[in-house]
Amino acid sequence: MKINIGSGYDKIPDFVSIDYDKDNEPDYCLNVETDTLPFEDNAVETVVAHHILEHLGDGYFHCLQELYRVCKHGAIIDIRVPHPRHDAFLADPTHRRPITPMGLQLFSKKFNELSKKNGWPSSTLAEYFKVDFDILEWHYIPEEKYKQAFVGKPKEFIEEYINERNNIIKEFHIKLIVNKE
């Protein structure tokens, strides 16, 4: 099974759509912050979560726990979120939390173990919430006018440039893999 949470009007063929707004006519109208997903354990192989996670408040953790429950081992969660230092994130009053690769790695048991071993001051959220997501891949989506400016530049230059300025990176695209073994 494939699900699209926070689907809005974006219907993806062969995906079950889930949205809070009944006007979007989802397959399931529910609140992912509080409701139990209507699927059996280990039933989902792919999740699309495009521009939804940044809208979640305290229910963010519940949503991740529910995704973990319904996903099979090896399931892929495809996340797209606005970069927290872009006006698209800052201007929308419904954006409640920044979502970053650094924040998502806290939901990895491997990263939690590495943090404890090295004495890093990071939250062991995988252990606390009993989930385990590893980052399979992630990349920046820069604003169109910066795409050419970065061609051939060393990664260190790009990172420094991004960290010193706003509105350079429009989005993060992140893929998580679910670990249950």
How does the language model describe each region?
Residues 2-85:
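Conserved SAM-binding loop
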